[in-house]
């Protein structure tokens, strides 16, 4: 479907557009008004966002690219309650101090990925605690709660799924959709914001905000959702077996971040190039046309471009160089490291223990099977002896050894007086 708005055409071609309220009216507004203010919200449940939020961050970048002003709403208030959307059970209530620290961490991450200058399209950060913390309960029930139908609220997926499964839904969580709806109204009053973007699980919350604005006789508001981020196996992205894929470099280094995207399924490469990079669509189509082993080149481009956006050009190039070094048996000094002590080396460390300690394998039994299957290498030499021990001879006067598990996981083992 062709739109008048270049922004809508762009996000549709790249795969961002999932659902939209009154898309014809939004198309008209975006094509006629060059100064639209839009917002995307993030809850503050961790000290960093992970790649599950990457689509929304890219949408912020694209809003700026097309001349619109984005608002980043940090849920300092709503995080105190917890969004029930897509959750099987209630989140633990975080202490206020933790939420405030998380806000600082998320701000630091976002400042590397979108522009917060004072220009026309410069993003602004707001915290909904600034207005939610001051709400008087009786006034809120009378002025806002009266516009919500419990019958209708029970039909939204975030509520219905929990109730159908006979899973507990607290009154605290039930209030979340009222507060998010109120956020949209508040942002319209304060900043003239008329457009909200969120993940597909936020559809009900977005619609509630639009309906509330109508009942309060405000200008027409619009909402758009992006698709749920799933990989080729249908699994929700954002976490791996070894933990979340964080966007903060202090929680996940640029090399591991690069490697995550280098190792995505072949079927995901084209889609991720469209969603997570700034490459022109013609260049992406050329990369999408690569087949078989050539697909690995497209994966390297994907990994490098995504890492540039999150960690900067220098870190992306260092990560790419380290990966090439590891795969081509060259100097692997740029790889992430794991430190052991001289005392451990003197006593000797069973290779099985080291594979487990570094997190390469979830158990010593799995480590044993990896070795038996010729999947483990020390300094690029395959080790198939399950009793193999890492000792001073393994280092041969070098400051580190390279430990490899399979073809895609590599780490350097360093020696220090004390473990870091």
From Swiss-Prot:
Binding, L-tyrosine: 39, 176, 180
Chain location of the short sequence motif 'HIGH' region per the record? 44-53
Q: Where in the cell is it found?
A: Cytoplasm
Report domain S4 RNA-binding positions: 349-414
The record's section on SUPFAM superfamilies has: Alpha-L RNA-binding motif, Nucleotidylyl transferase
> What molecular function does GO assign, one term?
ATP binding
One GO term (biological process):
tyrosyl-tRNA aminoacylation
Motif 'KMSKS' region: which residue numbers?
236-240
Chief location? cytoplasm
EC number from the UniProt entry: 6.1.1.1
Q: Which Pfam family, an example, fits this chain? A: SYY_C-terminal
The alphabetized UniProt keywords are:
Aminoacyl-tRNA synthetase, ATP-binding, Cytoplasm, Ligase, Nucleotide-binding, Protein biosynthesis, RNA-binding
Do the record's keywords include Cytoplasm? yes
Query: Single GO cellular component annotation?
Result: cytosol
What catalytic activity is recorded? tRNA(Tyr) + L-tyrosine + ATP = L-tyrosyl-tRNA(Tyr) + AMP + diphosphate + H(+)
Among InterPro entries, the record links this protein to: aa-tRNA-synth_Ic (IPR002305), Rossmann-like_a/b/a_fold (IPR014729), S4_RNA-bd_sf (IPR036986), SYY-like_C (IPR054608), Tyr-tRNA-ligase (IPR002307), Tyr-tRNA-ligase_bac-type (IPR024088), Tyr-tRNA-ligase_bac_1 (IPR024107)
UniProt: ATP binding residues: 239
The record's family statement is: Belongs to the class-I aminoacyl-tRNA synthetase family. TyrS type 1 subfamily.
Question: What is the documented function of this protein?
Answer: Catalyzes the attachment of tyrosine to tRNA(Tyr) in a two-step reaction: tyrosine is first activated by ATP to form Tyr-AMP and then transferred to the acceptor end of tRNA(Tyr).
* Assembly: Homodimer.
**Name of this chain's protein:** Tyrosine--tRNA ligase
